[in-house]
UniProtKB/Swiss-Prot annotation:
It comes from Encephalitozoon cuniculi (strain GB-M1) (Microsporidian parasite). Its main location: cytoplasm. Its EC number is 1.1.1.21. The active site is at 51 (proton donor). It catalyses: an alditol + NAD(+) = an aldose + NADH + H(+); an alditol + NADP(+) = an aldose + NADPH + H(+). It is found in: Cytoplasm. It is an enzyme of class 1 (oxidoreductase). GO terms for cellular component: cytoplasm. Gene3D superfamilies: NADP-dependent oxidoreductase domain. Belongs to the aldo/keto reductase family. This is Aldose reductase.
Amino acid sequence: MICKTQKLNNGKEIPTVGLGTWGMEDEAVLEGAIRNALSLGYRHIDTAFIYGNEKMIGNILKKLFDEGVVQRKDLFITSKLWNTFHGCPEDGLRRSLNDLQMDYVDLYLIHWPVTFDPAPDGTVESCGKKYNVGKFDAVGVWKKMEALVDLGLAKSIGISNFGKANTEKILGTCRICPAAIQIELHPYLNQKELVEFMKSKGIQVISYSSLGSAPGSSAKVRDDKTIKAIAKKYGCAPSQIILSYITAQGICVIPKSRSKEHLRENIDLKELSREDISAIDALNTGHRYVDPPGFGPEKFK
């Protein structure tokens, strides 16, 4: 049976399945997705400063709080520190909290192990095609992240898109261990070695791009013939097989969907046989759908 929550190393719990919001920039569409998700029992909403939708999410959730649909204490909200705020994570988080209209987030992640120095005009919102990549100081940024927990602005802190090297730098000096890591993970990129390392350190793994696709990409994991054959065997959608495969490993997922039907499918997970899990394991090619150019040599390290 798939557990509904996973316990973090600080004793707090994170829902196994959450709602991803990357790419959702239309407020009406986003509100529909959040309302549908909450009605189905979702309680984790994943966002980030760079997604550009935190203000919309804040407006939507305030409306839902006022309507009595859900209470803040029942939600798990994740946001992420953008690359231009490494010098002052508190500033980055306070901007997100202001937009979200919240006093705290449940999980705050360093979005990338990549630092962007401010633009010549002093702005920090840079996210275009030209990046002013600076030197990433994993230990220094993490110490500032720890202060966010002390201030009560984040219940848990973690990392995203990190590999073993930068994670070990943090673990060697940290006062508060990263509670979670968010990485691209799907049958074509199962990241077995990194997952085992994170588990050995008590760091909860969260998969993004779980269904294996990205804007402009060609081969989608859910169209893979092996995935489709297993889905036919279980009488369900290919996406359900992929999410079942990932969550069976104790990994959280945050699939994005606007459709209530798909949202329902994404929490209706199946118990896969060992044979089917092995068949999906064999699909690993190491293919990344998310590999931003211009992010420098530290990305994924």
